[in-house]
UniProtKB/Swiss-Prot annotation:
This is Centrosomal protein of 19 kDa. Belongs to the CEP19 family. The gene is CEP19. InterPro entries: CEP19. It comes from Bos taurus. The keyword Cytoplasm applies.
Length: 163
């Protein structure tokens, strides 16, 4: 299917994913409504998003829509089924998709830890400077202020005496 996705959204009643796309051959904007079936407030959003994206009926239309965006839409739907407002659901999604630097990752279970690691990997890839970037500098020299007195630690002085 030759189409370009323009917008993707969700309808709560009856539950459906709505895609607005442009047909490249005719140049017309069209709307596709993909009903969400067998989805409850206990359903896994990532699994539901994968199933919808891999559905042969919708696959051609959802090629340009990221899996992460579909997961987010399903999270909105699940929040609505739990009775949360949109603001509460957005806040919950924000908490799930950001990393708290003060959080102790040793206390997380394996599934949550894998989720946090994937978020950190995405952030690293997004912030990483590559050679092709216009503001890439190979050798960065940083000057540290020497005004302050250097503090020594006990283990520094002990190891200096050994040598």
């Amino acid at each position: 299917m030759m189409c370009t996705a323009k917008k993707c959204g969700i309808r709560f009643q009856p539950p459906a994913i709505i895609l607005i796309y442009e047909n490249e051959i005719k140049g017309k904007s069209r709307q596709r409504i993909m009903p969400v079936r067998n989805f409850s407030k206990y359903s896994d959003c990532s699994r539901a998003a994968e199933q919808l994206k891999n559905n042969p009926r919708h696959k051609g239309y959802l090629e340009q829509v990221s899996l992460k965006q579909l997961e987010k839409l399903f999270s909105f739907l699940r929040g609505n089924l739990w009775g949360q407002s949109l603001a509460e659901t957005m806040e919950q999604i924000q908490r799930e998709t950001t990393i708290d630097p003060e959080e102790d990752l040793n206390k997380l279970d394996d599934k949550e830890l894998a989720k946090r690691k994937s978020i950190m990997d995405e952030l690293f890839e997004k912030n990483q400077k590559k050679k092709d970037d216009p503001n890439f500098v190979y050798d960065i020299e940083v000057e540290f202020p020497q005004d302050e007195q250097l503090q020594s630690c006990g283990w520094d002085t002990e190891s200096a005496e050994e040598f």
